[in-house]
Amino acid sequence: MATKSKETIPKKKSSKIIGIQFSILSPDEIRKSSVAEITSRDTYINNKPVIGGLFDSRMGVLEPGLICPTDGLDYMETPGYFGHIELARPVFYIQYLTTIMKILRCVCIKCSKLKISKENYKQALKMASEERWNYVFKLASSSSITRCGDDSEDGCGCLQPKKIKKEGLATLFAEWDNINGLSEEDKEKLNMKLTPEIVLKIFRRISDDDVNFMGFSPVFSRPDWMVCQV
C-alpha cells in the first residue's frame, strides 16, 4: 500500500497558549451555541428520538444505526452537543448566590447605580479584578451609606436595605431598619422578598461602567448572567 513520505505531509504549526479567559455564558451565547431548543419532556416515539424532546438526535445519537444530523457521525464518533430550555421564570444559579447577595449590597435597589463615587475611588481601577471587587464591596456595603447618593453625586435618594439575607436554600430578602414614625403594620412591610425576577431587573440596569468598576466584565461576566434564564 502506498504511503506518503514525511516530506509530503504538511506540518501543522502549533499555537502557544498565553492565557485562559473564564466567563459566564450569557443567555444569548447559550442560545447561539445550542443545537436544539427542548420543548417536550418526551424521549421516544416508536423507538425514534422525539424532535425537541430530551433525547433530540441533534444533540448526538445513542443507538447503533442512527446518524447525528448535526455532524453526520454515528453514536461511536459524535462528541455530543447541548440543547437549551427557555425557562418560564428565571432562577438563581446556586453557585453564584453569595456573589449575587454582595452585588445587591453594592448597587441601589431602585435605580441600580453603584452606591459609591467612581471619581472619588478611581484608584481602584489600577487594582486587579478580584482585589478591586473586594475593595468596592467593602466601601459600598458600608453602614454609613443609608441612601443612594450619600457617597455619589447622582443618586436617586432611595433608602437602602440594611441587610440582604438568605432564608432556606435560595430565598433572598431585603431588610430595612425600623423607621421612626411608622406603625407596627407598616414596619412589617420593611422586609421585601427579592425574587429572581426582581434581582434580574436590578442587575440588567447596572451600567457597563459600574460593572467594570466593581471588577466584573461587561463582556465576560455581567451580573445579570448569574440569574439563569435559559
Language-model regions: role of each:
Residues 1-230:
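Conserved core architecture of multi-subunit DNA-directed RNA polymerases
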